């Protein structure tokens, strides 16, 4: 019984923490702000081109971190640097909330992209 109560408490705590991560961004605002992302990453966040990562279903915190890294120059990509330059912290939170709320497609991407 103690074990079940402990597991239930842990599960409830994790659900609350997950909701808090999503609470920082507004999904509807993110959808509008992400319109420029659709050309490369797809309108549903599931890019069909293997050189652009799928954003749908990614962890919210990961997307926020990556967008900040592009904006701050910690990640070097000319396209993303230009796309990210004018985003505010709230824009980043909203865009991350939008893409993380979308279902991902688990089919195999066609083609192969060479790494650096």
What are these regions (language model features)?
Residues 1-9:
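Bacterial N-terminal signal peptides that target proteins for export
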Residues 10-14:
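Hydrophobic alpha-helical targeting segments used for export or membrane insertion
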Residues 24-34, 43, 75-116:
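Flexible coil segments in periplasmic/lumen-exposed cytochrome c-class electron-transfer proteins
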Residues 66, 70, 83-86:
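Amphipathic alpha-helical segments that mediate coupling or scaffolding at interfaces
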Residues 31-69:
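N-terminal targeting signals for Sec/Tat export/insertion, comprising classic cleavable signal peptides
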Residues 16-18:
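N-terminal signal peptide c-region/cleavage motif recognized by signal peptidases
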Residues 8, 47, 62, 87-90:
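A broad, structure-centric signal for solvent-exposed, well-ordered loop/edge residues
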């Amino acid at each position: 019984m103690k074990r079940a109560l402990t597991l239930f408490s842990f599960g409830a705590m994790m659900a609350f923490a997950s909701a808090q991560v999503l609470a920082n961004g507004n999904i509807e605002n993110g959808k509008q702000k992400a319109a420029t992302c659709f050309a490369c990453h797809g309108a549903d966040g599931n890019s069909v081109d293997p050189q652009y990562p799928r954003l749908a279903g990614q962890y919210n915190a990961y997307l926020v971190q990556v967008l900040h890294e592009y904006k701050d120059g910690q990640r070097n990509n000319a396209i993303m640097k230009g796309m990210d330059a004018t985003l505010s912290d709230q824009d980043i939170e909203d865009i991350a909330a939008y893409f993380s709320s979308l279902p991902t497609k688990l089919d195999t991407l066609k083609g192969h992209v060479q790494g650096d």
